[in-house]
């Protein structure tokens, strides 16, 4: 009954089969037509799947056994910080006083929740070196957009509305130019130098009177620390622009150096990365934004403040860009992040970064004789290697990533950043053991050897997974997003087969 490819729950459906019987209704039946306008009433019976309770349980248990996550295997997905999420976080998030509270309750009834929000704001201010922090943004890109809208409001307030350009490095996350566009800015690219850092001369070339900001990650997406960050800040600030810190790589510098100390005016953090909020399955995430004093009056409202021994919402933010997320934001992630920060303490967070950097450099050192390493200096928490050596045997980085699946390892990020040919970005995080790192390294070395001696083994990978190579082109151009579309597609397949047989 269980096959490699699981049928959809709709395909398991059998008419009049059900999992649960409702008790007999002793309330008078009222026609829904008497309660709702006709336009809201379904014209046809909903096509819900009809399955037994046992089939229902088996279906979702089967699917869950096919999931892959940090709890099941190594997940070195570069720029994503797929670290272990401590289970104490889940215990705290399930405390009934938090999990059963309602965002519309009166302030005096949710003092505990407001205290968590306020306390987390204070912790993040200290960690980042910012003067104020809002927790509202729902994820990293939302945080980017929020910060850029603050920049935009600041420039407009100061008679600088002509500033419509945001500088992004050629190694930047794709969300950076996308967020700039959503905020109404144009993106201008600054090149990297031979060391993988921002090219200072090119920066001087692109900075002008229209520069609103520069968006940087430090360490950058190549895993390299921008040693000239103070000079970069001086160049942009003297031109009237602002510095924005993309917090995707904060895991490398905790309690070592703070964005505020590097001269950044705003920062977003990923609580679902650095601070162990789970981010598998698409979310929920959380992307708090911190700003320096001159931008504090532009933050989204309300803020949570402490008034003597009570916590309350503060809507008195004169230049606020307005609310960017309903109610508290993603409060459950706040709880997990706050638990993590308080559990680790300052020394623990410092050790996090030290171990993350050590692990990345250990892998890089052991792989340098088997793969092209574009940048030879010590990396921070991640690094990028190139598959150009393997390409001469007809094997690409994509093929090697597929082969890694046979070893029970989630592939690293591939073909990113864009300025490395056949790039593979590896971020092991601090939570992995040396034994796990060695297993991954040995797998990579074996794959490198196979590309020379048995390339077909790599080209035809994966060999052990439920699904092998996807037809990604067709999936992108002709996506099947609804069960009705799947039925239509299967009908076409059967029709074509019948035609060929005849």
UniProtKB/Swiss-Prot annotation:
GO terms for cellular component: cytosol; glycine cleavage complex. Transmembrane segments: none annotated. It catalyses: N(6)-[(R)-lipoyl]-L-lysyl-[glycine-cleavage complex H protein] + glycine + H(+) = N(6)-[(R)-S(8)-aminomethyldihydrolipoyl]-L-lysyl-[glycine-cleavage complex H protein] + CO2. Gene3D superfamilies: 6.20.440.10, Aspartate Aminotransferase, domain 1, Type I PLP-dependent aspartate aminotransferase-like (Major domain). InterPro entries: GcvPB, GDC-P_C, GDC-P_N, GDC_P, PyrdxlP-dep_Trfase, PyrdxlP-dep_Trfase_major, PyrdxlP-dep_Trfase_small. GO terms for biological process: glycine decarboxylation via glycine cleavage system. CDD domains: GDC-P. SUPFAM superfamilies: PLP-dependent transferases. Pfam families: GcvP2_C, GDC-P. Keywords: Oxidoreductase, Pyridoxal phosphate. Its cofactor is pyridoxal 5'-phosphate. GO terms for molecular function: glycine binding; glycine dehydrogenase (decarboxylating) activity; pyridoxal phosphate binding. Its EC number is 1.4.4.2. It comes from the Bacteria. The modification N6-(pyridoxal phosphate)lysine is found at residue 273. NCBIfam families: PRK04366.1. Belongs to the GcvP family. C-terminal subunit subfamily. The glycine cleavage system catalyzes the degradation of glycine. The P protein binds the alpha-amino group of glycine through its pyridoxal phosphate cofactor; CO(2) is released and the remaining methylamine moiety is then transferred to the lipoamide cofactor of the H protein. This is Probable glycine dehydrogenase (decarboxylating) subunit 2.
